[in-house]
From Swiss-Prot:
PANTHER family: HEAT SHOCK PROTEIN 70KDA
Gene3D superfamilies: 1.20.1270.10, 3.30.420.40, Actin, Chain A, domain 4 (3.90.640.10), Substrate Binding Domain Of DNAk, Chain A, domain 1 (2.60.34.10)
Function: Ribosome-bound, Hsp70-type chaperone that assists in the cotranslational folding of newly synthesized proteins in the cytosol. Stimulates folding by interacting with nascent chains, binding to short, largely hydrophobic sequences exposed by unfolded proteins, thereby stabilizing longer, more slowly translated, and aggregation-prone nascent polypeptides and domains that cannot fold stably until fully synthesized. The Hsp70-protein substrate interaction depends on ATP-binding and on allosteric regulation between the NBD and the SBD.
EC number of this enzyme: 3.6.4.10
Molecular function terms from GO: ATP binding; ATP hydrolysis activity; ATP-dependent protein folding chaperone
Full protein name: Ribosome-associated molecular chaperone SSB1
EC top class named in words: hydrolase
Region (Substrate binding domain (SBD)): 403-613
Motif (Nuclear export signal): 574-582
């Protein structure tokens, strides 16, 4: 490699199954690896002698299944007990162990047992992509723009940034995959000043995003985004693998579930069959000596493949409906529907999408495997001042956060500070106060999600604001300041206004227990469960009203001047009603109606008592 440092920043699409790298030098170039392939498998293999990354790792996977690691993107930024992690562990041939609540990958390397974090495995893939670029450019690469699914949460974004740092890269920006693809499409389509609504449908190997953008000239504004960080080509392969596994068992009586090598060979054949069925209507899967000397041969038609995956294919339309709803536009107002990600080559996926948009012609003008890296390279050139042509010089990218951010208030009620689909970077403020007299510490638990009840959302982290001057409840003014940077990474600061005391947290190591089901359904659940959310909010509101009224009655009854004016019988009745109200407050199961009735009964007793003075 020649001396010197590359002044620009490369663009890396770090994919679940394949990765791609691009550079910008007056125009974007997708860089092929040493095998001449423009995409590189996101695989890392460990042997007694060496470590292999990319094609070399994937090619030996069947011979060394337990030490060949893939799908690191499905682990990154997730907790070990995440539902999707637990489900994936069952199908992976490599071992995943738990350490401090985080998943680690255990392999045999250089004849020793070693463990690696998902960030480390991802950093190895990033290093490979960096080396591919350096071989082409002839200079050392230090800066990169790395892409993530739009629906990645705070923990997953931060972990990806960390992987870049481990790979020796200064990650200038984390950008969303569909937004990067939109840049590739928007520039390729020729810059038009006419306003266009463009829907990016990005179905890759392991993740799925839908983003709706408004493109006007060089300004790309994301209006809404939705998706599933655990849906892609891998899942279609898995369903096909299950189908053939049963077929093999029916034919031979052999169950290959516990044979990692047989499973890897069958998965590779399934991936090949899936690709064949995108162009042909049927294909044959043939594997010599799959298990116990038994050969396996089976035919599969496109129709059968579509049937096996019909539920997953149909589920891709839910985020499409969601973004249209969030962006408040009808499907007829969408000017272009752009396909991104290798899995959009599947004819059935295309047909469902086209039918949804009333037979609309889908945009296939950009390469679905390369568009994301292309857009990342353009962004890299802009951030390093290397963009030379007019198209890219004036380009402005306005992205959004995928899920609301906020804090838990008394009663575990979620108080959103930054609503979902807010353009980033952003700073939002919200004022809070104390709930008890002379309270000197307030805890700020920070959540991400769409539900009223915080337990239904993801806890990202928590911090305390201490040394608040002791005052009556409700008097201190505490301001929570949420700053989301252009990477979508959050910093929260709380300030007590009278003293200027502050505490803050950068949510860099989020607790990250967002299960796939929660991510997938968070927004649709918020609608489906709106009634229970409303009931939760109403109950909390009534409880607060009762608590406030009880406190005022207690102060009246205990005030020597006021209580002396009450007849004993009236005072007894008020105290009895007060006791009932306190009991209602103590019962966990009390409903909003129970609190309302208790408040009414207490009000009656007080009104009567005061009238008989």
């Amino acid at each position: 490699m020649a001396d010197g440092v590359f002044q620009g920043a490369i663009g890396i699409d770090l994919g679940t199954t394949y990765s791609c790298v691009a550079t910008y030098d007056s125009a974007v170039e997708i860089i092929a690896n040493e095998q001449g392939n423009r995409v590189t498998p996101s695989f890392v293999a460990f042997t007694s002698e060496e470590r292999l990354i990319g094609d070399a790792a994937k090619n030996q996977a069947a011979l060394n299944p337990k030490n060949t690691v893939f799908d690191a993107k499905r682990l990154i930024g997730r907790a070990f007990d995440d539902e999707s992690v637990q489900k994936d562990i069952k199908s992976w041939p490599f071992k995943v162990v738990e350490s401090n609540g985080q998943p680690l990958i255990e392999v045999e390397y250089l004849d020793e047992t070693k463990t690696f974090s998902p960030q480390e495995i991802s950093s190895m893939v990033l290093t490979k992509m960096k080396e591919i670029a350096e071989a082409k450019i002839g200079k050392k690469v230090e800066k990169a723009v790395v892409t993530v699914p739009a629906y990645f949460n705070d923990a997953q974004r931060q972990a990806t940034k960390d992987a870049g740092a481990i790979a020796g890269l200064n990650v200038l920006r984390i950008i969303n995959e569909p937004t990067a693809a939109a840049i590739a499409y928007g520039l390729g389509a020729g810059k038009s000043e006419k306003e266009r609504h463009v829907l990016i449908f990005d179905l890759g190997g392991g993740t799925f995003d839908v983003s709706l953008l408004n493109i006007t000239g060089g300004v790309f504004t994301v209006k809404a985004t939705a998706g599933d960080t655990h849906l892609g080509g891998q899942d279609f392969d898995t369903n096909l693998l299950e189908h053939f596994k049963k077929e093999f068992q029916k034919k031979t009586g052999n169950d290959i579930s516990s044979d990692a090598r047989a499973l890897r060979r069958l998965r590779t054949a399934c991936e090949r069959a899936k690709r064949s069925l995108s162009s042909g209507t049927q294909t044959t899967v043939e594997i010599d000596s799959l298990f116990d000397g038994e050969d396996f041969s089976a035919n599969i038609t496109r129709a059968r493949f579509e049937d096996i995956n019909s539920a997953l294919f149909k589920s891709t339309l839910e985020p499409v409906e969601q973004v249209l709803k969030d962006a408040k536009i009808s499907k007829s107002q969408v000017d272009e529907v752009v396909l991104v990600g290798g899995s959009t080559r599947i004819p059935k996926v295309q047909k469902l999408l086209s039918d949804f948009f009333d037979g609309k012609q889908l945009e296939k003008s950009i390469n679905p495997d390369e568009a994301v890296a292309y857009g990342a390279a353009v962004q890299g050139a802009i951030l390093t001042g290397q963009s030379t042509n007019d198209d890219t010089k004036d380009l402005l990218l306005l992205d959004v956060i995928p899920l609301s951010l906020g804090v838990a208030m008394q009663g575990n009620v979620f108080a959103p500070v930054v609503p979902r689909n807010t353009t980033v970077p952003t700073i939002k403020r919200r004022t809070f106060t104390t709930v008890a007299d002379h309270q000197t510490t307030v805890q700020f638990p920070v959540y991400q999600g769409e539900r009223v009840n915080c337990t239904e959302n993801t806890l990202l982290g928590e911090f305390d604001l201490k040394n608040i001057p002791p005052m009556q409840a409700g008097e201190p003014v505490l301001e929570a300041i949420f700053e989301v940077d252009a990477n979508g990474i959050l910093k929260v600061t709380a300030v007590e206004k009278s003293t200027g005391r502050s505490a803050n947290i950068t949510i860099s190591n989020s607790i990250g227990r967002l299960s796939t089901e929660e991510i997938e359904k968070m927004i649709s659940d918020a609608e489906k469960f709106k009634s229970s959310d409303d009931a939760f909010a109403k109950r909390h509101e009534q409880k607060q009203k009762l608590e406030a009224y009880v406190a005022s009655v207690e102060s009246t009854v205990t005030d020597p001047v006021l209580s002396a004016k009450l007849k004993k019988s009236a005072k007894d009745k008020i105290e009895a009603a007060l006791s009932d109200a306190l009991q209602t407050l103590e019962i966990e199961e009390s409903s909003a109606d129970d609190y309302r009735k208790a408040e009414l009964a207490l009000k009656r007793a007080v009104t009567k008592g005061m009238a008989t003075r």
